[in-house]
Structure formats: C-alpha cells, structure tokens
Amino acid sequence: MEVRGHADFAELGKDPVCAGASVLAMTAAQCVKSMEEAGRLRKKAHIVIRGGRVLVTAKPREEAFDEARLLFWTAETGMRLLSEAYPGHIKVKKEE
C-alpha cells in the first residue's frame, strides 16, 4: 500500500482529506508493525513514512493471510470512501 502527495482540498496542515488518508495509512502501518512484532509475518515488513509518503508492504504467514488482507482491504475501503466524498482529491489505484 502506498499513499503519497497532497489532496489539495485545503492548505497544508488544515486539510481534512489529507488527515483522513493519513490516519488510514498510519493505522495500516501500525497494524503491520504489530503483526510483525507478533511473529505473524514471513519476513520483516517494509514501512516508509517520509515527506508526504507512506509505503507499507508485508508478507504474512499463511495463518495470518486473512488478517493482513482484511487490514489492507479496510484501508483501501476507507480511501475509496474518501475518494467518493471528495472527488478529484483522492485517487485510488489497485495493483496486484
């Protein structure tokens, strides 16, 4: 999952669309980190949080696959809801 850029709904630091997207991305990152700490990933998670960009990748163990899928699906669903509520400010692209 990658979230980057600015929604340009309001000025930087006062943008509720960016705040919503940031909360979703940071929550996904924290959940993946928690999965890693619990030994539920096959290898170390890749989490980058820097300058308007959040990148989260994880390779779950077989028994944690559904948990990871639900985590990313939830974040994606939240992003899609933001995209519908604020068209033109959030783009959601899904890559397999």
Q: Model-found features: residue ranges?
A:
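N-terminal intrinsically disordered, cationic/polar leader segments
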Residues: M1-P16, M26, Q30-E96
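Short, conserved glycine- and acidic-residue-centered signature motifs
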Residues: V17-A21
